[in-house]
Swiss-Prot record:
This is Actin-related protein 2. The modification N6-acetyllysine is found at residues 299, 322. The keyword Cytoplasm applies. It comes from the Eukaryota. It comes from Bos taurus (Bovine). InterPro entries: Actin, Actin/actin-like_CS, ATPase_NBD. ATP-binding component of the Arp2/3 complex, a multiprotein complex that mediates actin polymerization upon stimulation by nucleation-promoting factor (NPF). The Arp2/3 complex mediates the formation of branched actin networks in the cytoplasm, providing the force for cell motility. Seems to contact the pointed end of the daughter actin filament. In podocytes, required for the formation of lamellipodia downstream of AVIL and PLCE1 regulation. Keywords: Acetylation, Actin-binding, ATP-binding, Cell projection, Cytoplasm, Cytoskeleton, Nucleotide-binding, Nucleus. ATP binds at residues 160-162, 214-218, 305-310.
Amino acid sequence: MDSQGRKVVVCDNGTGFVKCGYAGSNFPEHIFPALVGRPIIRSTTKVGNIEIKDLMVGDEASELRSMLEVNYPMENGIVRNWDDMKHLWDYTFGPEKLNIDTRNCKILLTEPPMNPTKNREKIVEVMFETYQFSGVYVAIQAVLTLYAQGLLTGVVVDSGDGVTHICPVYEGFSLPHLTRRLDIAGRDITRYLIKLLLLRGYAFNHSADFETVRMIKEKLCYVGYNIEQEQKLALETTVLVESYTLPDGRIIKVGGERFEAPEALFQPHLINVEGVGVAELLFNTIQAADIDTRSEFYKHIVLSGGSTMYPGLPSRLERELKQLYLERVLKGDVEKLSKFKIRIEDPPRRKHMVFLGGAVLADIMKDKDNFWMTRQEYQEKGVRVLEKLGVTVR
């Protein structure tokens, strides 16, 4: 609460999950899938203790997904369906989750770097007009990740469900001219895993199966350190094969797919996306930075988001960065490589890093009125109130 007794809410709306809670807390109060479902066949039945309604959101929608047509309101970190997004926010602020009187609260929201201005304007409009929050702030996710890590300078590799960003931050300011975006993230890897399992002869078709495969991915996938070796193992042995029991009781076997799916992060051509993978993108970003800041950036690479949780990802990233540095900067001079210092931080709670940083920032700022955009300012200026964030509104 701030000095006037208003609650300060932090809401990290991810493409895949909503993480919400209060300023100063060190864990989100609620984490639930960002999905909205409508029944395929209208019926008034109950499933277990959940009643099927015309509109199901979050956890309930996820549990009953086999009977629903499921929609994700966000794609690649951008809101695509505002009506469904409002249903998601109603659920977040309503009795199911936070149960707050929004008129008497301030809210800190997060957004990916390089997000379209129109998207941000609309979010602010909805927060003030529909929910009538007394104050709103929108923070860039990568900056919050560094705050949570206690840093002001570093490069954040943030890979969630909808989008992967490489975002250098210097002295607490994100550097948009160096920020790189890769439209491959958790959801694409799940899609690719479905395709690989189809090739093995397992059929997944309904939107409900998507959630099932996501769970398989989270349980079994990893990033291979040496792809040639992994492929050899997959072809010649069965050491990689694991069994997984599906919700309907069937058992499937997953082998080489375990490392082949996340490989798309490093080799986008596997899923027909043009461009370089996450390691080369990170290398290019740091090399494009000012020569004086490069070594700082190499020493403070911070992983964030659920799609950086694969076992083996930090070591593979480090291996590829060293290889690229050796080839392109040192021109193959191995002797000099020992002077190249690199550190990749992979905090165990990186799934919720953005929320944690938001909770820290909101707590520090809760009584600083010049920090928040207020409802009164919005009524006077409309979306031009965003100038307060240091974001020019065109």
